[in-house]
UniProtKB/Swiss-Prot annotation:
Miscellaneous remark of the record: Plants silencing 4CL3 exhibit significant lignin reduction, reduced plant height, decreased panicle fertility and abnormal anther development.
Lineage per the UniProt record: Eukaryota, Viridiplantae, Streptophyta, Embryophyta, Tracheophyta
Protein name as catalogued: 4-coumarate--CoA ligase 3
Gene Ontology biological process terms in this record: phenylpropanoid metabolic process
Tissues expressing this chain: Expressed in root exodermis and epidermis cells, stem vascular cells, leaf developing vascular bundle cells and parenchyma cells, lemma, palea, stamens and pistil.
Gene: 4CL3
Amino acid sequence: MGSVAAEEVVVFRSKLPDIEIDNSMTLQEYCFARMAEVGARPCLIDGQTGESYTYAEVESASRRAAAGLRRMGVGKGDVVMSLLRNCPEFAFSFLGAARLGAATTTANPFYTPHEVHRQAEAAGARVIVTEACAVEKVREFAAERGVPVVTVDGAFDGCVEFREVLAAEELDADADVHPDDVVALPYSSGTTGLPKGVMLTHRSLITSVAQQVDGENPNLYFSKDDVILCLLPLFHIYSLNSVLLAGLRAGSTIVIMRKFDLGALVDLVRKHNITIAPFVPPIVVEIAKSPRVTAEDLASIRMVMSGAAPMGKDLQDAFMAKIPNAVLGQGYGMTEAGPVLAMCLAFAKEPFKVKSGSCGTVVRNAELKIVDPDTGTSLGRNQSGEICIRGEQIMKGYLNDPEATKNTIDEDGWLHTGDIGFVDDDDEIFIVDRLKEIIKYKGFQVPPAELEALLITHPEIKDAAVVSMKDDLAGEVPVAFIVRTEGSEITEDEIKKFVAKEVVFYKRINKVFFTDSIPKNPSGKILRKDLRARLAAGIPDAVAAAAADAPKSS
């Protein structure tokens, strides 16, 4: 459909026509709308245990989970924390909370206790649903706040087993839920700063899923005959939205993996004839480079969705040699955007030819524009600028943070992504840089400000700055520039260990460079571009070596 000019603003739209989206219903009503057709079909399969649940059983489990959570005091407007790896109980709990008009805040079970406590406190969690590997991380918070803890994989002192939650009678009727009520509360660092609660409503998630899988020619063609691999963590919005919710809406079968293991992945693909494989580039790298994986192993896969981080042409070519029967394409998203901004049109029921390196075209029923990051002026085709998106799929705002919301969504409803890219003559979007400070380690967000705030609590660190450094396997890794206090001889290894005790594995500092000062502008903001330029020039290694040999100073 190309671009249209309105008040000198160049607006880009999908090549696919807009569709009618009924986002006046609740998310669970939307996901189970085809129950009469798919009720007896397999819905969720636990890849680890082999246990299978039909659509009717999943819907019933969500009603029982709702009743059980209500008995624990959860009601409309409350928040349930899901601190889980992928498992069927994640879906039961999420959908159950939705029926009560409650929201689920998703968190990584490998977070440190400090990270878990901070999110649970900020979100106002009323109940925490977790598992054995994380239960000890929540005990102190739960005891202090009187928050019940539910465990999905066994009995633990002071905790409620999830099977007890499911023992409740089915909820007779859902709560009176408004489309603009919050249903998901993932945490994101946005374009800068510490993690913030992203308020995604029933309306926004329905709109986002519909933009992908609804319509006569859906952008993302899932069918009830497809078997989707759910390997990417459901606590990440990409997997929750484009795998679980999109799969439920389409009536597909979803095979759940708790963690990535290449051998187990191949076994599940063969056993269940997996047809849809949502991956991130680090998984693609491992498959491409593994001599153990053959084209025969992965022959059933017809579609590989890659999101969360860019992927180059050389990697694509090596990977496709292993999955010759599949279409490979990329999407582009941001938690605050609902999360999908763009999707590869090669995934459509009636596919389009796409270019390598593109992250797709803007989703239907949405508008996208490119603006000059300095002036805000709207830019045309093939001109790089900040990507902005508008539509009913974007977040309601940040929880309890109107200032951050105002800085992200402008008065005209445009969400500013902080990503730099352009739209070419064929409406395909290319990402070229990032305005925002967030580091992407294997698709996971690493906010520099969080690490900097932690680093300067060390008595031997006077100042610190964290930036990204390119890495072949991870995409990016966090590295720290450190100014020591006068007389300090703190080492790189000591700093790494100090950070590692407080943060999840992917936020750990990869390398430390000692320096005399951190470059800042007159207002005190760290000049990260200057530090990245030093990395690109190879200067930090010399600085680090000199610092190791020289007397320590401030």
